[in-house]
Amino acid sequence: MIIKIHNQTSFCIKPFKSLLIKMFLPIKEKKIMHLIFVTNEKIQELNSFYRQKNYPTDVLSFHNDLTFFAGLEDNSLGDVFISFPKAQEQAKTFKHSLEREIAFLAVHGFLHLKGYQHRTEEEFQIMLALQEKILQKVGLNLDKTK
């Protein structure tokens, strides 16, 4: 899988790029996924327009049928928008590193693009287990503060 990372914020995301690429590299699918880092204002705008929820959220996923970055490529899986400020806030709240939070949100968005949902407790547990499995492969366990 090819990961294309876009930064639409003033925050430095360079320290996270190699982890994100390493995390998705083992996936043998010949698709492109765009990870777009945005502000709370931008993600709130997207959340309001597409989900009718007028507040900032941490991560949003859009399949390639929408005209963001993914809409420009035939072999695109989709776009994952991550609010960098929300990731910072959640890392503090959950008492783990920003690296771990960003990785978690990227994996969460990826799984949504692959069709996973968490509308029921069963779906939530399946998705959580998959997230943990992917994070463990790069040394970021859900129960660790790394």
Curated annotation (Swiss-Prot):
Q: What residues bind Zn(2+), as annotated?
A: H108, H112, H118
Swiss-Prot/TrEMBL keywords: Cytoplasm, Endonuclease, Hydrolase, Metal-binding, Nuclease, Ribosome biogenesis, rRNA processing, Zinc
Q: What is its main location?
A: cytoplasm
Q: What does the entry's cofactor note say about binding and number?
A: Binds 1 zinc ion.
What Gene Ontology molecular-function terms does this entry list?
metalloendopeptidase activity; RNA endonuclease activity; zinc ion binding
- Pfam families associated with the record: YbeY
Q: Which Gene3D superfamilies match?
A: Metalloproteases ('zincins'), catalytic domain
The subcellular location is: Cytoplasm
- InterPro entries associated with the record: MetalPrtase_cat_dom_sf_prd, YbeY
Briefly state the protein's biological role.
Single strand-specific metallo-endoribonuclease involved in late-stage 70S ribosome quality control and in maturation of the 3' terminus of the 16S rRNA.
Q: Does the keyword Metal-binding apply?
A: yes
Cofactor(s) essential for the protein:
Zn(2+)
The EC number of this protein is 3.1.-.-
Q: Which domain of life is it from?
A: Bacteria
Q: Which family does it belong to?
A: Belongs to the endoribonuclease YbeY family.
Q: Which GO terms describe its biological process?
A: rRNA processing
* NCBIfam families registered for this protein in UniProt: rRNA maturation RNase YbeY
Q: What is this protein called?
A: Endoribonuclease YbeY
GO cellular component, as recorded = cytoplasm
Q: Does the record carry Aminoacyl-tRNA synthetase as a key word? A: no
